[in-house]
Amino acid sequence: MPVEVKLYTRADCHLCAEAKATIETVAEEVDTPVTIAEVDVDTDETLRAEYGERVPYVFVDGWPAFKYEVDAEELRRQLQDA
């Protein structure tokens, strides 16, 4: 079963673009199947209130994993351990 990586983001967020690029690169490198779900917090009032400016925020397999920056080595470890 694939591991879900959920990326909470918003438009015009350079850190979000960097996080997405790191996630996509690592997902291609690991043997574990990965699905990536990108959620724009500005499309939902509840999410906008919850995350505010605190994006990117990344969940791996349902657990909070990264805020602002994604560490490629740590993400790789989390995906392999999931």
Report the location of each language-model feature:
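Local sequence-structure signature of Cys/Sec-based thiol-disulfide redox active-site neighborhoods
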Residues: M1-E29
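Haloarchaeal acidic low-complexity proteome signature biased toward cell-envelope/secretome components but also
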Residues: M1-K6, T32-P33, R77-A82
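Thiol-based oxidoreductase modules, predominantly thioredoxin-like and allied folds used
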Residues: T32-E45
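Active-site loop of classical SDR/Rossmann-like NAD(P)-dependent oxidoreductases
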Residues: R48
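Surface-exposed interaction regions that form or flank ligand-binding interfaces
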Residues: Y51
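A short, hydrophobic beta-strand/beta-hairpin element that forms part of a small beta-sheet core
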Residues: V55-A65
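N-terminal, polar/charged subdomain of small-to-medium soluble alpha/beta proteins
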Residues: K67-V70, E74
